């Protein structure tokens, strides 16, 4: 078994073949922390901006939104909604995101966890599948963390 090397890193051949290597590299590029940092609390729901999802999926925001509009019946209001002008301004102020002049004239769309799951039926590339799996794992992890905190708070209340 040969080990290929370059000046910056070593690559060990994958016994499962080149496709498996490709899948793993996409998942590795998208860290859980990077996804977690893109999840916002909007209208009381954990959600992600269309532009952040588009970057993760490797498509333009316009193409992502076009695919959604072609399948709009799959995205009810609790799966996807458009930010109001006030919400956009609030995000710009709070996070320095959505900087003026860098985005289109349209207000951003936001996808809840269910909306992100539904995107997998609209965006069908191999990358989209891997990205969706990674995002779903992060949402599950966040639920587990929240559940653990609730349990700890309950136990603390019992001790008092």
What kind of feature is each model-predicted range?
Residues 1-160:
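Basic, low-complexity intrinsically disordered segments
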């Amino acid at each position: 078994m040969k080990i290929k090397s370059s000046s910056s890193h070593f690559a060990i051949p994958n016994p499962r073949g080149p496709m498996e290597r490709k899948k793993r590299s996409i998942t590795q590029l998208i860290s859980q922390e990077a996804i977690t940092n893109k999840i916002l609390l909007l209208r009381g729901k954990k959600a992600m901006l269309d532009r952040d999802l588009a970057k993760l999926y490797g498509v333009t925001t316009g193409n992502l939104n076009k695919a959604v509009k072609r399948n709009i019946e799959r995205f009810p209001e609790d799966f996807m909604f458009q930010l109001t002008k006030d919400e956009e301004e609030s995000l710009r102020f709070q996070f320095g995101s959505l900087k003026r002049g860098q985005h289109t004239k349209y207000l951003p769309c936001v996808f809840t966890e269910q909306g992100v799951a539904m995107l997998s039926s609209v965006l069908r590339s191999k990358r989209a599948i891997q990205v969706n799996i990674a995002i779903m794992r992060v949402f599950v992890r966040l639920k587990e963390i929240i559940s653990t905190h609730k349990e700890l708070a309950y136990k603390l209340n019992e001790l008092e």
